[in-house]
Regions:
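Predominantly extracellular beta-rich ligand-binding scaffolds that present long acidic/polar faces
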Residues: 24, 33-270
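Positively charged n-region of N-terminal signal peptides that target proteins for export
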Residues: 1-8
Length: 270
């Protein structure tokens, strides 16, 4: 039997259905601006490796524990099918408010250990059935390798794009989301925090898959009560249209065991 969970989360002392949509989003945008001012600090980028061209994006794969910053907007429109998402990343990517646009794949295939991704915009991503990666920003956050420990922070990231995964991994389980498709953490020494992020995405799926998790912020999780997974001050807009049997769909998370969600808002067509 088809199951869908619709996660529309608000941490306000009001009922969302009684508030005009425009008013809610105006309040959210105002608060989001305040959060940004409080968390974005002046930074000395002298020890950061610059990313200013599409070719520079490959640097994320060279030194996976390095510190990188964008010094310009990046247009990936001519790199369809050739960009290889970073694997095993455990460094820092500071977007400095810049935009990566016209991507046809996820930015990171996997993030492990301690890592930070902040102050970044993803715009006009177009993920097709044959394109690499599951998601827009991160495919998997995975602490399973070698019992890794640490803290992962995803902060001040805005994602806008569309995805058609109707033919992707037909007949298999999986997940898809705006920020991170799957989070795998188990120990009390491991934590993931997603703060002050927003997505405006359109996803369509018809894969015949089972146990599929589709979410605005995260897709699915494997974790227990000892580890920490926190989603705070996030906004999710757009649509997720799935005819997959036994799929789990949510505006914030498709499947979210032991996830702490605070002050988040979703307005998605599911």
């Amino acid at each position: 039997m088809r199951r869908k969970t619709i996660a529309i989360l608000l941490c306000f002392a009001v009922i969302a259905g009684l508030i005009p949509n425009k008013e809610v989003m105006n309040v959210t945008a105002k608060e989001k601006k305040v959060y940004s001012k409080s968390v974005v600090k002046a930074n000395n980028y002298s020890d950061y490796e610059e990313i200013k061209t599409p070719e520079d994006m490959d640097k994320l794969n060279y030194v996976v524990d390095g510190k990188y910053c964008l010094s310009a907007d990046i247009d990936m429109s001519e790199y369809e099918g050739t960009y290889k998402p970073a694997e095993g990343f455990r460094g820092v990517l500071d977007g400095r408010g810049h935009t990566i646009k016209n991507l046809h794949s996820v930015v990171f295939d996997s993030i492990v250990g301690s890592a930070t991704v902040r102050d970044l915009k993803i715009k006009n991503s177009n993920i097709g059935s044959d394109d690499y990666g599951k998601g827009f920003l991160i495919n998997t956050i995975d602490f399973a390798y070698d019992g890794l420990k640490g803290k992962i922070l995803i902060e001040n990231v805005d994602v806008e794009g569309k995805a058609d995964v109707s033919k992707y991994q037909k007949g298999e389980s999986g997940s898809f989301a705006g920020i991170c498709s799957y989070v795998n953490i188990h120990k009390e020494t491991q934590s993931v925090k997603i703060n002050n992020c927003s997505v405006n995405i359109k996803m369509s799926t018809d894969t015949g898959n089972y146990a599929i998790y589709y979410g605005g912020i995260i897709g699915g999780t494997t974790r227990n009560s000892k580890s920490t997974l926190e989603i705070s001050n996030c906004v999710s807009l757009g649509s997720i249209k799935s005819s997959d049997t036994d799929s789990m769909v949510g505006g914030i998370a498709g499947e979210a065991d032991y996830v702490n969600t605070t002050n988040c808002y979703a307005d998605m067509e599911l």
